[in-house]
Every structure is written in structure tokens, then in C-alpha cells.
């Protein structure tokens, strides 16, 4: 039986990628992880997992990885998992567009670049492409408009990619991830609303939001076990929903009116307090 190979991007310590690559290795698949060039990789070395440096926003970096993977696998790749991603938390009206461009470069153009350069290896193996999406790409979760936009873009691109790759017997799975216990928000913990923001009455709410530990999350290794199992099926789900809150959100998205989220998030994010503060300020200015 020939060796199977799985390549997972974004395998830094504490994230979904690390959990996914660990699960592929546990199943006897030759797991190939990537980490940022300056990112620690001791956790992968200790686990005996093959790893290479990769910056998905850099064309030369992707081409260097391709050459290494081709040499290792003989030009075939059974599974490509596009997991590398970053977050940016801010209100839509206070968004730093340059920061959002960086996020799109990683979350959207990164997977596009990987598929562009690795598709021939995947076709030769009649393999699978797994794109890690999010419930944020489905619902208007507050303070996440830009991140949500990257995931919505990824998910729609992945949806079309699935149809386009079908003639080559390549399976494309879009994973709609619920809340999973990872450290993706660690770089946002310092973020605060800009001075003078219309959202300033909720400044403390925002601070608590970016420093929060979500109360109900799915263990990342449990998540990985289910996602990997799905990716290895001969007929996987087109959209695979998994993780905390994903079942509820899937139901509401399918069967409820489009604005069902408005009232839910109005209460969850205390928007009534913001409306009162804005109305009071407007009256004083009259």
C-alpha cells in the first residue's frame, strides 16, 4: 500500500492546524506541516512531524514549499488543508483597511495561491482539498465584519472550486467551524476602539470581548478528529459543519429569516446601550 501524504498550512502551536496535522499523523498518513519562517516549530519536531517554513502570502515561499513537497512525495499529494489564518477584531466603521488587506492576503489569497500551485499534485493523487471556514462567514457576528468577510469569500470560492474540481475526481470540503478552543485571538487581545469612535460607549464591552475566553468551545483535537475523518471519506460533505454553536447556527441560517441575527446580537452585544448613548448625545447637540 502506497504512502499517503497530507499537507496542512498554519500549524503553529496551540492552533487548529497543529491539531489537524497531529491527527493525520496518528492515522498513519505522512503528515507535512507548515509554520511561518520565524515561528517556533519545536512542537512539531518533538512529535516527529515533517515541517517546512511557509508564508502563504509570498509567491516565492509557496514555490519553494512545492519543490520540497514534490521531492518528498514523488509529485503526488492526497490531502491539502488550507488552515493558515489570522483574525482582526474591530467595528466595521473603525476598520484599518491595511490590516484587513493583510488578513485577506492570508485567509483568502493564501488558499488560492496554494491551490493554484498544488492542484496538479492533488489531481494526480485524486485527492482532497480542505478549506477551513467559519460560522463567521455565515452570520453577522459583531466586531468581526472584516474577518467574517474573509471567511465568506473563502467559503464561496471553495464552493465553486468543488464544482470545478469534480471532473478530476478531486474532493473539496468546506469546513464551517464553530467555536474551537485555540489561540487565534491572542494577537487581538491588545486591541481597543479608537478614540472618538461612535462605539466609544461600548469601549469596556469591546475590551472584554477581545480578551474573553469563550465559555463553550470545542476541544481542538476533538474537532480535528472529526474534520480529518471527513476529509478521508470517499464522498465527504460539501460543507462540513463542526464545532460549538455550528448546529444551531446552521439551523437558524437555513430556516429563519435573514434578520434573525439582528435581535440576537442586539442583546448579546448590548447595542441598546449604544443607541441610548447616541440618542442622548444627539439631543444635547440640538
Curated annotation (Swiss-Prot):
Q: Name one GO biological process term.
A: triglyceride catabolic process
Q: What is its EC number?
A: 1.1.1.-
Q: In which pathway does it act?
A: Secondary metabolite biosynthesis
- Name the enzyme group at the top EC level: oxidoreductase
The record's keywords, sorted A to Z, are:
NADP, Oxidoreductase
Active site per database record: 147, 151
| Listed GO MF terms | acylglycerone-phosphate reductase (NADP+) activity; triacylglycerol lipase activity
Phenotype caused by lack of the gene: Impairs the production of flavoglaucin and congeners, and leads to very low accumulation of the carboxylic acid (8E,10E,12E)-3,5,7-trihydroxytetradeca-8,10,12-trienoic acid.
SUPFAM superfamilies in the record: NAD(P)-binding Rossmann-fold domains
Keyword Aminoacyl-tRNA synthetase listed: no
Function per UniProt: The PKS fogA releases the carboxylic acid (8E,10E,12E)-3,5,7-trihydroxytetradeca-8,10,12-trienoic acid as its product, as well as derivatives with one and two double bonds.
- Protein known as: Short-chain dehydrogenase fogD
Q: Which organism is it from?
A: Aspergillus ruber (strain CBS 135680)
Amino acid at each position: 500500500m502506497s504512502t499517503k501524504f497530507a499537507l496542512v498550512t498554519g500549524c503553529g502551536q496551540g492552533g487548529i492546524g497543529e491539531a489537524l496535522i497531529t491527527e493525520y499523523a496518528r492515522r498513519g498518513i505522512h503528515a507535512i506541516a507548515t509554520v511561518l519562517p520565524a515561528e517556533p516549530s519545536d512542537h512539531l519536531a518533538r512529535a516527529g512531524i515533517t515541517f517546512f517554513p511557509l508564508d502563504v502570502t509570498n509567491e516565492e515561499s509557496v514555490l519553494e514549499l512545492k519543490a520540497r513537497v514534490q521531492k518528498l512525495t514523488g509529485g503526488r499529494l492526497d490531502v491539502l488543508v488550507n488552515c493558515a489564518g489570522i483574525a482582526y477584531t474591530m467595528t466595521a466603521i473603525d476598520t484599518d483597511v491595511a490590516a484587513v488587506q493583510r488578513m485577506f492576503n492570508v485567509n483568502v489569497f493564501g488558499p488560492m495561491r496554494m491551490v493554484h500551485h498544488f492542484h496538479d499534485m492533488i489531481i494526480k493523487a485524486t485527492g482532497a482539498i480542505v478549506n477551513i471556514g467559519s460560522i463567521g462567514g455565515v452570520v453577522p457576528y459583531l466586531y468581526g465584519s472584516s474577518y467574517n468577510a474573509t471567511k465568506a469569500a473563502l467559503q464561496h470560492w471553495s464552493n465553486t472550486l468543488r464544482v470545478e474540481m469534480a471532473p478530476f475526481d478531486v474532493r473539496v470540503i468546506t469546513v464551517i467551524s464553530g467555536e474551537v478552543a485555540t489561540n487565534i485571538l491572542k494577537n487581538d487581545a491588545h486591541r481597543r476602539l479608537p478614540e472618538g469612535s461612535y462605539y466609544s460607549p461600548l469601549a469596556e464591552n469591546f475590551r472584554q470581548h477581545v480578551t474573553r475566553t469563550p465559555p463553550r468551545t470545542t476541544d481542538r483535537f476533538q474537532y480535528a478528529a472529526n474534520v480529518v475523518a471527513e476529509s478521508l471519506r470517499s464522498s465527504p460533505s460539501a460543507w462540513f459543519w463542526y464545532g460549538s454553536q455550528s448546529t444551531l447556527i446552521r439551523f437558524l441560517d437555513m430556516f429563519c429569516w435573514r434578520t434573525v441575527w439582528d435581535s440576537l446580537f442586539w442583546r448579546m452585544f448590548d447595542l441598546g446601550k449604544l443607541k441610548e448613548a447616541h440618542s442622548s448625545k444627539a439631543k444635547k447637540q440640538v
